[in-house]
């Protein structure tokens, strides 16, 4: 979906709500998952209505995911709390494809890495309302000025936007700068957004539209990563090509770029927390760059031991997962794929690794052959460090 289409439907919503909604959508699309949409406006209105919407019920104190190997509990590692709910109301996290083989944009993880520990972070931008918080005014302004320098442009004026608190106006959530032909916004959660007035034309040799092939998309993304290399700061740009279909079978791309880094763990972290997405209009012009940096205000808690993908699969089948889908996991035969990555929502108190399972939902099968794959999360951290390991009963409050 194009930025201008969203704008028409959502121009009256609070900035903080819109930012978190857009952030969630971009994050899930990057991994090949998107929020299943009923309509353009309804896709985002769940954020407004979530306090009243029916949310998936989680039954606590699920089975202890004890690894088969001996367990030594490190007292220096604090217990972690999983999010109570993953959205609800107007949709759920899933992807619509004709076949799982079309899934793209997945994590750089693979089982051959044989990872035994991964870092966990306290989310410094944690906010149950989804409003950007975390960095102070000076740090936000510093990032804004650095972005302007990277774009070789001069800031003409700035606007300050403040978050809301129960007692009134809160700290600065966003600073927006006006420059020649563009607007640059820096957020308290570390994000940067650049909007080009009227769209920035690309060389004619590049095709930057939803109906572009993977090869055409690769070419334009590498071009954009090079053109805006100072802004991105990526030493080894890697592509995450993804997208999904509408109910009628129209394909929409949702590609992104991240830094491959110097190791597999660094690649997974950058893929999950530090990535760039480029948005075009119907003419194939660049209208927006969105650069995420969710670890900008996070604090590392330590490296936690993790389970294997096979152990996670066992937990999935036993019901120890969290999901925004309104269906109980239908069974082992419907598990279509798995990847290891981090969730990066501002409504998560901790950033920890999960095994993200793509599960075919037979209830959502369509006559035109499209299948919906719901996303089911199993925490990768040993269960002994999870304070509220869940079991989802498929019901609603």
Region roles according to the model:
Residues 7, 35-38, 44, 275, ...:
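Generic recognition of cysteine residues
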Residues 1-31:
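Disordered, charged N-terminal biogenesis/targeting segments of membrane/secreted proteins
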Residues 184-201, 265-293, 363-397:
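A short, surface-exposed beta-strand/turn
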Residues 220-355, 359-366, 370-371:
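Segments that shape or occlude catalytic/ligand-binding pockets
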Residues 29-56:
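Internal signal-anchor transmembrane helix that establishes type II topology
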Residues 57-232, 239-247, 251-268, 273, ...:
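Preferential activation on post-signal-peptide N-terminal prodomains/segments
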